[in-house]
From Swiss-Prot:
This is Small ribosomal subunit protein uS15m. CDD domains: Ribosomal_S15p_S13e (cd00353). Gene3D superfamilies: S15/NS1, RNA-binding. It is found in: Mitochondrion. Expressed in anterior and posterior midgut primordia in stage 11 embryos. In stage 13 embryos, expression is high in the developing midgut and hindgut. In stage 16 embryos, expression is elevated in the midgut, hindgut, and in a small region that will give rise to pharyngeal muscles and to the stomatogastric nervous system. In larvae, expression is predominant in the gut, and head, presumably in pharyngeal muscles. It comes from Drosophila melanogaster (Fruit fly). PANTHER family: 28S RIBOSOMAL PROTEIN S15, MITOCHONDRIAL, SMALL RIBOSOMAL SUBUNIT PROTEIN US15M. The gene is bonsai.
Length: 280
């Protein structure tokens, strides 16, 4: 082992595993959290089911006049919240179908089918939030989401205005399947993050260098004006052709005045901002 290390240090570093070395860049990559297939973020459901009223009765007994005279303990037996869960699912399903059905007896159109599936999907999603290990409901929910997505695909192909209308009524987002699947790998992600880091570093250094040059503009122009005046005086005294004209010197002085005014305005703006931040 020592012999291999000596060879690697002496000659070409072909024995050193440089790909396994830790980078000095302060870049940390975290694998994106996997979203379950039954979550609303994946299924496309933008809204949840409305909360159930505490005094909501079973649909069959809403118009029963005898319940108005009955005792509270008797009324509680006919409340929807005190009965089986499938009755609540049926209640939500019927209410959602009423919003999209074409007529009172419409239960077989594409809109009614999508409303039924959406109500059941959202009920199952609420169940999975409370019981995430329920495998049977998870499988049913996944199959129902895929079936609804297939129906939406067909409706989008057949009647696009009706497709948009049903999405608006049911608070859905249609997510078509991707054309190709792309794996998220650590290597590719680190390459992209490194490119972004290098680009930001380059921009920061260029900005710092630009500010440094801007800070040197006024001293540079002052020194340049002095030198131009000196060169002009020497050329006149030596009786040689004058290359530095008064117009050049005047232009440099005007540029110097503009830079000083700009610097004063920036200083006033920065001081005003600091005062406002201090008051806040």
């Amino acid at each position: 082992m020592n012999k291999l290390l000596n060879i690697a240090q002496a000659g070409h570093r072909q024995f050193v595993r440089e790909y396994a070395f830790k980078s000095d860049l302060k870049i940390k990559w975290m694998r994106p959290e996997k979203i379950a297939c039954y979550k609303p973020e994946k299924s496309g459901d933008l809204a949840k089911l409305p909360p159930l009223k505490a005094d909501e009765l079973l649909p069959e007994y809403r118009d029963c006049k005898e319940l108005d005279k009955a005792d509270e303990s008797v009324k509680s037996l006919f409340k929807l919240s005190n009965n089986a869960s499938y009755l609540t699912t049926k209640f939500y399903r019927d209410e959602m179908v009423k919003e999209v059905q074409r007529h009172a007896q419409d239960f077989g159109s594409m809109e009614a089918k999508l409303a039924k599936m959406t109500a059941v999907i959202r009920r199952y999603q609420e169940h999975m939030d409370k019981h995430p290990r329920d495998k049977m409901i998870k499988v049913r929910l996944k199959e129902l989401i895929d079936k609804r997505k297939k129906f939406l695909k067909y409706l989008r192909r057949w009647d696009y205005p009706r497709f948009e209308w049903i999405l608006e009524k049911l608070d859905l987002v249609y997510k078509p399947p991707p054309t190709h699947f792309h794996w998220i790998t650590r290597k590719e992600s680190l390459q992209k993050l490194t490119d972004i880091y290098c680009e930001n570093l380059k921009e920061e250094r260029l900005e710092a260098y630009h500010k440094q040059l801007q800070a040197q503009q006024i001293p540079f122009l002052e020194e340049a004006i002095k030198k131009m005046q000196f060169v002009r005086q020497e050329q006149i005294s030596c009786d040689v052709p004058v290359t530095v004209t008064e117009e050049k010197i005047a232009d440099s002085k005007r540029q110097l005045e503009m830079l000083k005014e700009l610097q004063q305005a920036e200083a006033a703006a920065s001081s005003k901002k600091q005062n406002e931040d201090g008051f806040n």
